[in-house]
């Protein structure tokens, strides 16, 4: 007698995928979609809540200036918070911005640096040819 194979249903996300509280100022448009497209070239996939945050972080007003000069978020018990920062940093690097990532511990900033290098390499870019690292 053979065992019957029962296909499993894909797991559905449990809980609200949007913040329970947020203060996002009105804006004209966002560069978030472009940032996500750059990020997803690395074969990584952004979650909906990450896209929501990136849209707000990269929001511009009618004059083309950043809507939010500072942006903070608290997402307790959720994986992927550091990836939001990586998405923003990756976007900035692609636009010629200089990125300074600080942290309380050297190991934390080194981990962020290595994560960003991995994303660049997973995107098909080569160190020395497409980008230069300064450590």
Predicted regions and their residues:
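Phosphate/NTP-binding elements of NTP-utilizing enzymes
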Residues: 2-135
């Amino acid at each position: 007698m053979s065992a019957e194979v029962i296909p499993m249903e894909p797991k559905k996300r449990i809980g609200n995928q949007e913040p329970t509280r947020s203060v996002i100022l009105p804006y004209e448009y966002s560069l978030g979609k472009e940032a996500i497209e750059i990020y997803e070239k690395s074969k990584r996939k952004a979650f909906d809540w990450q896209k929501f945050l990136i849209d707000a972080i990269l929001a511009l007003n009618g004059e083309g200036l950043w809507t939010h000069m500072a942006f903070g978020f608290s997402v307790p018990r959720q994986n992927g918070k550091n990836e939001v920062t990586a998405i923003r940093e990756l976007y900035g690097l692609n636009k010629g911005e200089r990125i300074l990532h600080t942290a309380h511990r050297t190991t934390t900033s080194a981990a962020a640096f290595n994560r960003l290098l991995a994303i660049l390499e997973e995107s098909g870019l080569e160190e020395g040819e497409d980008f230069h690292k300064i450590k």
